[in-house]
């Protein structure tokens, strides 16, 4: 059934635009250039407003997810990476459940990637239509069919651009992946803005600066009671404060510390006697994949819930899924869940909120830990990083584990890899919950993604530089 499905979608994959693999080795400086160009295009798209929208001043229903999904309201990057991640989530789960069987051959892998891309474009069209028809940019009946179609086309083309930019980096022209690059950029931009924003906000206490650090100096300069000003800078409500900033730095440090946790399995060459090495199995074996997939799941649940709430607000089943309220305190107007399943799957706003509603906190913790562990365990089976796949890679490199025969390598790797995947996913979820409870800027999920992605890029740079260095040693 699985192979038949991949064969059925094969003709459709041919019509999709594709980035060809490089025919030569791309040099490090060239990779940096292509990565910078990709990031520049993404940032430009984040600033270009959608043509034809009547208004985007209403409460933002996806405010909480925008940082993680690298989206920017009212611009070409309205959808961000949501369609790509959602298609990846669904296709990987289908493959993991063996509903779609993907073989080890390059042909099957290519067909699977093509199916994922096709599904991603289908989701882009679907989300574009939902955004327009639910009135995010104004009443569709007032805008007219032509304008609605124009906005949908703009969102579709922007989605295609994101997909191709990601593929450009994935094919080896740049460093890392487009998805990771866009997420990290968006989160870091948010953290810097919340710390140094010069924007003023009219609160009940008077005009205040949004940026936590700028607010500190402003409060100390304008208030006569310096102790009270200092306390306000650290603990003010509805705007970024210094405790949020300290929590963010603390979580950054903790995640970087855990990145170093790993088990080194001793391996040796089957061909050359005396050639020894180690195969590292990290605590975060699947890196940030669990948190990305979990974010995609929650964001799509939010989309469905708010779409149904807008149409059938009094329905009991719709209310059980989620009820929503609008707020504009301390920033732009945004919608947030106040009841139903969506409320319990959303993070508490602060540690005080945890004490006010402990049931909400417990459900959220269980959901985060369980979903991250599940996605991490599932991911290794469909991404070519399971014990069986690793044993196959070592065999192809003519490496064996010391003290074990080739036939027993899979059994030995199975002792470590599934455990590292599940426990690593659990730790990722726990750190995300901790960051949320401490009130870290950019949400716990966002901080986790930013740190793991930046660390990945650090490792890529070190690897690329070592290769350049070894080549230089050979040449000179």
Swiss-Prot record:
It comes from the Eukaryota. GO terms for molecular function: protein transmembrane transporter activity; ribosome binding; signal sequence binding. Its main location: endoplasmic reticulum. One of its GO terms (biological process) is cotranslational protein targeting to membrane. Pfam families: Plug_translocon, SecY. The SEC61 channel-forming translocon complex consists of channel-forming core components SEC61A1, SEC61B and SEC61G and different auxiliary components such as SEC62 and SEC63. The SEC61 channel associates with the multi-pass translocon (MPT) complex. This is Protein transport protein Sec61 subunit alpha isoform 1.
């Amino acid at each position: 059934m699985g192979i038949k499905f991949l064969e059925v979608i094969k003709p459709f994959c041919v019509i999709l635009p594709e980035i060809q693999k490089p025919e030569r080795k791309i040099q490090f400086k060239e990779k940096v250039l292509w990565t910078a160009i990709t990031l520049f295009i993404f940032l430009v798209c984040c600033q270009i407003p959608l043509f034809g929208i009547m208004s985007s001043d209403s409460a933002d229903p996806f405010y909480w997810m925008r940082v993680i999904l690298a989206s920017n309201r009212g611009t070409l990057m309205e959808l961000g990476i949501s369609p790509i991640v959602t298609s990846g989530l669904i296709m990987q789960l289908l493959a993991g459940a063996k509903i779609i069987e993907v073989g080890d051959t390059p042909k099957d892998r290519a067909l699977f990637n093509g199916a994922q891309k096709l599904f991603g474009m289908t989701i882009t069209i679907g989300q574009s239509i939902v955004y327009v028809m639910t009135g995010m940019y104004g009443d569709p009946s007032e805008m007219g069919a032509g304008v609605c179609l124009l906005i949908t086309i703009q969102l579709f083309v922007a989605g295609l651009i994101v997909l191709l930019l990601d593929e450009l980096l994935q094919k080896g022209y740049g460093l890392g992946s487009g998805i990771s690059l866009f997420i990290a950029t968006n989160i870091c931009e948010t953290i810097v803005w919340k710390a140094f924003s010069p924007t003023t906000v009219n609160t009940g206490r008077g005009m205040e600066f949004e940026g936590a650090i700028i607010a500190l100096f402003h409060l100390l300069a304008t208030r006569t009671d310096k102790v009270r000003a200092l306390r306000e800078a650290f603990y003010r409500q509805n705007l970024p404060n210094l405790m949020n900033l300290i929590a963010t730095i603390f979580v950054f440090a903790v995640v970087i510390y855990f990145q170093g946790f790993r088990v080194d399995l001793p391996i040796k060459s089957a061909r050359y006697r005396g050639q020894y090495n180690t195969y590292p199995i990290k605590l975060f074996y699947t890196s940030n994949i669990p948190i990305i997939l979990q974010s995609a799941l929650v964001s799509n649940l939010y989309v469905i819930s708010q779409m149904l709430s807008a149409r059938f607000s009094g329905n009991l089943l719709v209310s059980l899924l989620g009820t929503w309220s609008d707020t504009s305190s301390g920033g732009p107007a945004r919608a947030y869940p106040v009841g139903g399943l969506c409320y319990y799957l959303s993070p508490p706003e602060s540690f005080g909120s945890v004490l006010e509603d402990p049931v909400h906190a417990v459900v959220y913790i269980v959901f985060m830990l369980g979903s991250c562990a599940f996605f991490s365990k599932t991911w290794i089976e469909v991404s070519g990083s399971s014990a069986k796949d690793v044993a196959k890679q070592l065999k192809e490199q003519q490496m064996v584990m010391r003290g074990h025969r080739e036939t027993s390598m899979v059994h030995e790797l199975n002792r470590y890899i599934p455990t590292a995947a599940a426990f690593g996913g659990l730790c990722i979820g726990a750190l995300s919950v901790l960051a949320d409870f401490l009130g870290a800027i950019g949400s716990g999920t966002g901080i986790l993604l930013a740190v793991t992605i930046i660390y990945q890029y650090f490792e890529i740079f070190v690897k690329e530089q070592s290769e350049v260095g070894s080549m230089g040693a050979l040449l000179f």
